[in-house]
Protein backbone atom coordinates (compact mmCIF):
# COMPACT_ATOMS: atom_id res chain seq x y z
CA UNK A 1 0.00 0.00 0.00
CA UNK A 2 1.26 3.48 -0.85
CA UNK A 3 1.85 5.92 1.91
CA UNK A 4 2.62 9.61 2.08
CA UNK A 5 6.04 10.28 3.57
CA UNK A 6 6.80 13.55 5.34
CA UNK A 7 10.19 14.96 4.33
CA UNK A 8 12.34 17.92 5.40
CA UNK A 9 14.77 20.34 3.79
CA UNK A 10 17.53 17.97 4.93
CA UNK A 11 16.02 14.83 3.38
CA UNK A 12 14.63 16.48 0.23
CA UNK A 13 17.50 15.72 -2.16
CA UNK A 14 17.76 12.07 -1.12
CA UNK A 15 13.98 11.59 -1.34
CA UNK A 16 13.63 13.07 -4.85
CA UNK A 17 16.54 11.27 -6.52
CA UNK A 18 16.05 8.21 -8.64
CA UNK A 19 14.19 7.00 -11.68
CA UNK A 20 10.79 6.69 -10.04
CA UNK A 21 8.85 9.97 -10.22
CA UNK A 22 8.32 11.70 -6.87
CA UNK A 23 5.47 14.14 -6.36
CA UNK A 24 6.30 16.67 -3.64
CA UNK A 25 3.27 18.26 -1.99
CA UNK A 26 4.30 21.64 -0.53
CA UNK A 27 1.70 22.16 2.20
CA UNK A 28 0.85 23.83 5.52
CA UNK A 29 -1.58 23.03 8.34
CA UNK A 30 -3.57 26.23 7.72
CA UNK A 31 -3.97 25.66 3.95
CA UNK A 32 -7.54 24.67 3.02
CA UNK A 33 -6.73 23.37 -0.49
CA UNK A 34 -3.86 21.32 1.01
CA UNK A 35 -6.31 19.58 3.35
CA UNK A 36 -8.72 19.00 0.43
CA UNK A 37 -6.07 17.31 -1.74
CA UNK A 38 -4.62 15.10 1.04
CA UNK A 39 -7.14 12.22 0.61
CA UNK A 40 -6.71 12.42 -3.18
CA UNK A 41 -2.94 12.07 -2.80
CA UNK A 42 -3.40 9.11 -0.44
CA UNK A 43 -5.58 7.35 -3.04
CA UNK A 44 -3.10 8.03 -5.83
CA UNK A 45 -0.17 6.83 -3.68
CA UNK A 46 -2.01 3.54 -3.06
CA UNK A 47 -3.05 3.08 -6.69
CA UNK A 48 0.33 3.98 -8.19
CA UNK A 49 2.64 1.89 -5.98
CA UNK A 50 5.80 1.14 -7.94
CA UNK A 51 5.12 3.94 -10.43
CA UNK A 52 5.04 7.06 -8.23
CA UNK A 53 6.08 8.16 -4.75
CA UNK A 54 4.28 11.01 -3.03
CA UNK A 55 5.96 12.98 -0.28
CA UNK A 56 4.85 16.00 1.75
CA UNK A 57 6.98 18.97 2.79
CA UNK A 58 5.59 21.37 5.40
CA UNK A 59 6.52 24.87 4.18
CA UNK A 60 6.21 26.42 7.64
CA UNK A 61 8.79 24.04 9.10
CA UNK A 62 11.02 23.78 5.99
CA UNK A 63 11.52 27.08 4.20
CA UNK A 64 14.73 26.50 2.21
CA UNK A 65 13.38 24.00 -0.33
CA UNK A 66 10.21 25.93 -1.26
CA UNK A 67 12.30 29.10 -1.68
CA UNK A 68 14.84 27.23 -3.83
CA UNK A 69 12.10 26.02 -6.20
CA UNK A 70 10.21 29.32 -6.27
CA UNK A 71 7.17 28.05 -4.42
CA UNK A 72 5.48 31.34 -3.59
CA UNK A 73 2.02 30.02 -2.80
CA UNK A 74 0.45 26.83 -1.65
CA UNK A 75 -1.08 24.54 -2.56
CA UNK A 76 1.80 23.66 -4.91
CA UNK A 77 3.00 20.23 -6.04
CA UNK A 78 6.15 19.59 -8.06
CA UNK A 79 6.87 16.28 -9.79
CA UNK A 80 10.54 15.25 -9.82
CA UNK A 81 12.22 12.60 -11.95
CA UNK A 82 15.94 11.87 -11.63
CA UNK A 83 16.14 14.80 -9.19
CA UNK A 84 14.80 17.28 -11.77
CA UNK A 85 11.48 19.13 -11.63
CA UNK A 86 9.40 17.97 -14.61
CA UNK A 87 5.88 19.22 -13.74
CA UNK A 88 4.44 21.93 -11.48
CA UNK A 89 0.82 21.93 -10.31
CA UNK A 90 -0.57 24.93 -8.44
CA UNK A 91 -3.90 24.93 -6.64
CA UNK A 92 -6.38 22.19 -5.82
CA UNK A 93 -7.11 19.81 -8.66
CA UNK A 94 -9.63 16.92 -8.60
CA UNK A 95 -8.17 13.44 -8.99
CA UNK A 96 -9.03 12.95 -12.71
CA UNK A 97 -7.33 16.22 -13.70
CA UNK A 98 -4.37 15.55 -11.43
CA UNK A 99 -3.87 12.07 -12.90
CA UNK A 100 -4.07 13.54 -16.41
CA UNK A 101 -1.11 15.79 -15.53
CA UNK A 102 0.85 12.98 -13.84
CA UNK A 103 0.16 10.11 -16.27
CA UNK A 104 2.66 11.09 -19.01
CA UNK A 105 5.44 10.87 -16.43
CA UNK A 106 4.29 7.56 -14.92
CA UNK A 107 4.36 5.41 -18.05
CA UNK A 108 8.14 5.77 -18.27
CA UNK A 109 8.42 4.47 -14.71
CA UNK A 110 6.85 1.10 -15.47
CA UNK A 111 9.40 -1.59 -14.54
CA UNK A 112 10.90 -3.57 -17.40
CA UNK A 113 10.24 -7.33 -17.09
CA UNK A 114 13.34 -9.42 -16.53
CA UNK A 115 13.95 -12.78 -18.16
Regions found by a protein language model. Give the residues of each.
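Conserved Rossmann-like nucleotide-binding pocket used by diverse enzymes
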Residues: 3, 8, 27, 53-55
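A short beta-strand-turn-helix
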Residues: 4-22, 63
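Conserved helix-turn-beta segment immediately C-terminal to the redox Cys motif
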Residues: 20-21, 38-57
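Conserved redox-active cysteine motifs that mediate thiol-disulfide chemistry
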Residues: 26-40
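Structural micro-motif
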Residues: 63, 69-78
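Non-catalytic, surface beta->alpha helical segment in thiol-disulfide oxidoreductase systems
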Residues: 78-111
Amino acid sequence: MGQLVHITDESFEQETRGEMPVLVDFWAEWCGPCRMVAPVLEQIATEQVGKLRIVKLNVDENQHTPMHFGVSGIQTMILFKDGQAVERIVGFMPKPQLMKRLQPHLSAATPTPTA
